[in-house]
Design a protein with these regions (language model features):
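A metal-dependent, Asp-based hydrolase signature
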Residues: 91-175, 179
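Short, solvent-exposed loop/turn elements at domain surfaces
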Residues: 63-65, 86-88, 230-231
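Mature N-terminal segment immediately following signal peptide/propeptide cleavage
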Residues: 40-81
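Asp-based phosphoryl-transfer active-site loop
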Residues: 75-89, 281
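ATP-binding/phosphotransfer module of carbohydrate and carboxylate kinases, centering on a glycine-rich
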Residues: 15-16
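N-terminal secretory signal peptides
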Residues: 1-11, 23-28
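C-terminal cap/substrate-recognition subdomain and adjoining C-terminal extension
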Residues: 3, 19, 36-41, 45, ...
């Protein structure tokens, strides 16, 4: 029988053959070392099935003696961003950026001043803005995110993200990253996994800060993407202009499509929080071998927000986690992360 090595390099054969390890104090030391190792990996997690699922997955897929071993080149993990890696309520961060960009856009195009939905945004009436339709928001996004050189967009987005603060915490949006998920990113990378963001948000927008905030380089961000047009400036220097042409809608089925297009491998692990992530988790779970699929359930109104409507939580238009999705997670053996019960703390500043 082949000896199976444990996480500390101690296999069954050496355990049974080493007299020193048969003593109670020695066994207690081994048990204590295992517990300390587990707690040190993702310390912002409470002990429980969710934490254990992550640790068991990493141990099994990185242990060469395990039948579940995954070669390093196949170790890919994908993460949704909004509601999975950082706060998405009361509104998606990029949508807020676009709304705040409207005055600058109207200053360049005065003809938009009396046109809807720009007129409503300029009024500052939050109640009226909350009633804007999806078509209205799409029109605002096109006006504020396209028609400019890529470098200009990046500069404007960077300037905004470095100063914009959340209305509840009065902190930068980039400070409202879930510490438990940051630890998972780091834990996976420490064990040879490449981590990717696969988001319904704008690909170029997230790439502005992904390296600094998540340790994920821009080339490992897959998001909703618009076209670009090649051209030359007055001095003959080549540049790209962002065009109002949708290339990839990275929501729902667009997520596995984007993964295939831009990554080229099926993930071994996938993390999300809403119906828009369902197909990414399905696609991940349909592969051979060991897989890890996890969904964050926002059930902590005291520390963050509570919304579903799964399990009787309040309904929402932002990051909906439906009962149907919850039931599928149970059926397909995905792990549901309870923000309230599984996370010791939410943010690094706590």
């Amino acid at each position: 029988m082949k000896a199976i090595a444990g996480p500390l390099g101690v296999n069954r054969r050496s355990l049974l053959s080493a007299p020193a390890l048969l003593s109670v104090p020695a066994l207690l030391r081994v048990t204590s070392a295992l517990a300390q190792e587990q707690n040190s990996q993702i310390p912002s997690w409470n002990d429980g099935p969710a934490k254990q699922a992550i640790i068991d997955f990493v141990r099994a897929t990185t242990d060469r003696a395990s039948a579940k071993f995954v070669p390093p080149e196949e170790r890919i993990a994908t993460f949704d961003q909004d509601g999975t890696l950082w706060v998405e309520h009361p509104m998606y961060t990029q949508v807020l950026y676009c709304l705040e960009r409207v005055p600058a856009v109207v200053a360049q195009k005065p003809e938009l001043k009396e046109r809807e939905p720009f007129k409503t945004v300029l009024s500052g009436n939050r109640e009226a803005m909350a009633k804007l339709s999806l078509h209205d928001l799409e029109e605002i996004l096109v006006a504020t995110l396209t028609g400019m050189p890529v470098e200009v967009f990046e500069g404007e987005a960077k300037k905004w993200i470095e100063t914009a603060k959340h209305p509840r915490w009065k902190r930068l949006y980039t400070e409202l990253i879930y510490q438990p998920m940051l630890e998972v990113l780091q834990y996976l990378r420490a064990n040879g996994y490449r981590t990717y963001i696969v988001t319904g948000g704008g690909q170029d927008f997230v790439r502005v800060y992904s390296q600094q905030v998540y340790g994920i380089p821009p080339e490992q961000v897959v998001g909703t993407a618009t076209g670009t047009k090649y051209g030359y400036d007055k001095g003959g220097k080549p540049f790209l202009t962002k065009e109002p042409k949708l290339l990839l809608n990275d929501n729902d089925a667009g997520k596995p499509e984007g993964i295939h297009l831009e990554i080229g491998r099926r993930p071994r692990a996938a993390f999300g929080n809403s119906t828009g992530d369902r197909q990414m988790l399905e696609y991940t779970g349909a592969g051979d071998g060991t897989r890890l699929m996890m969904l964050v359930l926002h059930d902590d109104a005291q520390r963050e927000y509570a919304y579903g409507p799964a399990r009787g939580l309040p309904d929402t238009k932002v990051g909906a986690f439906t009962q149907k999705l919850y039931d599928q997670a149970m059926k397909d053996r995905w792990t549901v992360i309870s923000m309230k019960n599984d996370w010791k703390r939410l943010f690094a500043f706590e």
